[in-house]
Amino acid sequence: MGKEDKTHINVVVIGHVDSGKSTTTGHLIYKCGGIDKRTIEKFEKEAAELGKGSFKYAWVLDKLKAERERGITIDIALWKFETPKYYVTVIDAPGHRDFIKNMITGTSQADCAILIIAAGTGEFEAGISKDGQTREHALLAYTLGVKQLIVAINKMDTTKWSEARFNEIIKETSNFIKKVGYNPKTVAFVPISGFNGDNMLEASTNCPWYKGWEKEVKGGKATGKTLLEAIDSIEPPKRPTDKPLRLPLQDVYKIGGIGTVPVGRIETGILKPGMVVTFAPSNVTTEVKSVEMHHEQLSEGVPGDNVGFNVKNVSVKEIRRGNVAGDSKNDPPLGAASFDAQVIVLNHPGQVGAGYAPVLDCHTAHIACKFAELLQKIDRRTGKAVEESPKFIKSGDAAIVKMIPSKPMCVEAFTEYPPLGRFAVRDMRQTVAVGVIKKVEKAAAGSGKVTKSAAKAGGKK
C-alpha cells in the first residue's frame, strides 16, 4: 500500500486513572509514531535527569500533554501512529481535565475506543467499581456512537502472566461492557504490558498459554495476537462526503491583504472555492474565494480536514466561533428554535427539573440552554420510556428533554449530522450530563445578508 492510500482512523483511549493509558498510548506513538527520533532522545535525556527513566513512554505523553495544555501543539502529528493498514490519530489522551467535554465536542468522532484495564489485584476491581471512571467513559463512548471496542488487559507482568487472572478479568469485563451496550463477542481482549511491550507490536513469549484474540466481524471472524493487530482489525469508517456541508467555525481571523478567514473542521460534505456558503445562525451568505489547509491551497476540503477559507465582503463581526457554514444550495444550516434530546445525567449533586439552564457545549458552540420540559424518563440501555413527564431527573437517569437555547445556535439531529448532534452539559465547572439530539425545530429562515459576490455566483451557476 502506498503511503497515501492508508485510511485515517481515530481512536479514543479510555480507562481508570492508573490503568497505564499514558504508558500504553505513549508506547504505540513512540514505536510506530509521529515523533521524530530527536524529540524522543530529548525526552529520554530529560526523563533520566529527573530520575524518571521508568516512565519513558508515559513521559512522552506527559510532555505532549503539557504542550497541548499550554496551547503549544497545534501539531497533532505527535498524536499519530501508523499500523500496517491505518494512520491512527489518538483523539484525546485521557486524564486530560476536559476529557468528557472533549470527547463530545471533540474535533472528531472516534471510530473505536480502546479500553485499558489494569490486571493487578485490586486495581482491576477499582477501575470498574460502581463509581469508576471507566464505567462513565465506556458509557459515554457508547452513547456517542463509538460502536467498536478493543479491551487491552494491561500490567499482566504484575500477575506473573496468570492465565486464570486473565480469564477472570475477561469474564468480569464482558459483563461490564455488556451492561454499557457493547457485545463482547465483537471485542478483542488482548493481554499486554504497555511498559515492557508484550503483545503490543509483537507476540509475547511470556504467555505460552495465550492463543490469541478472536472477534466477530461483518462476514466472519478476525483473529490476531497483538494490540496492533487488534487496531488493524477495526472496521474502516464511512466518511460522510456525500452529506451536505457542515463546518462548525473554531475561529474567525482577519488577515491583512486577504480579508476574513473563518477556520474550522469539515464534519460532513465538501468545501470548494467558488461555492456559496451560508453561516447559521447569523444568516450570512457569501462566496468562498479559496480554501487552504496547512498553508497549502486545496481544490476541495473533505470531512476531517481542518481548513481556513477566505470569504468575500463579510466582516469579522458578522460571523463567529460556534457558527456553522453550509452549502446555500444543499440543505443550508439554520438556527434552532428548540430541540428534543436524550440527556444522560452523569454527576449532578441535586435534582434537575424544568427551568434548569446550564451551558451546552455542542461542536464549537458554547451557549446556555433551558431545560424547557422533561418529556419522558427512559431506560438508558433500551431507550424505552419508563415514566411520562417526570418532575425531575437525577444522576444516573436518562430522559428526553425539550431544550430552548438562550440565544441563536445551530445544532442538528444526531442521526443526520452526528458531530452537531451531541453535546455536553456543563455546570459547576464540570460535565454534569451528556446528550444526543433527537429532533430540531428550526428557526424560520429570515432574509439574511447575501453578499454581492454570492448573488453573482448564485446567478451564473
UniProtKB/Swiss-Prot annotation:
Region (G1): 15-22
Subcellular location: Cytoplasm
Sequence segments annotated as region (G4): 154-157
Region (G3), start-end ranges: 92-95
N6,N6-dimethyllysine: residues carrying this PTM: 3, 317
Gene3D superfamilies, alphabetized: P-loop containing nucleotide triphosphate hydrolases, Translation factors
Keywords: Cytoplasm, Elongation factor, GTP-binding, Methylation, Nucleotide-binding, Protein biosynthesis
Pfam family, one: GTP_EFTU_D2
Modified residues (N,N,N-trimethylglycine): 2
Region of interest called G2, as start-end residue ranges on this chain: 71-75
Listed GO MF terms: GTP binding; GTPase activity; translation elongation factor activity
Principal location listed in the UniProt entry: cytoplasm
Residues bearing the modification N6,N6,N6-trimethyllysine: 80
Positions of modified residues (N6-methyllysine): 3, 31, 317, 391
One Gene Ontology term, aspect cellular component: cytoplasm
Entries under HAMAP family matching the protein: EF_Tu_A (MF_00118_A)
Family assignment from sequence similarity: Belongs to the TRAFAC class translation factor GTPase superfamily. Classic translation factor GTPase family. EF-Tu/EF-1A subfamily.
The protein's name in its UniProt record: Elongation factor 1-alpha
Organism this protein belongs to: Pseudoechria curvicolla (Podospora curvicolla)
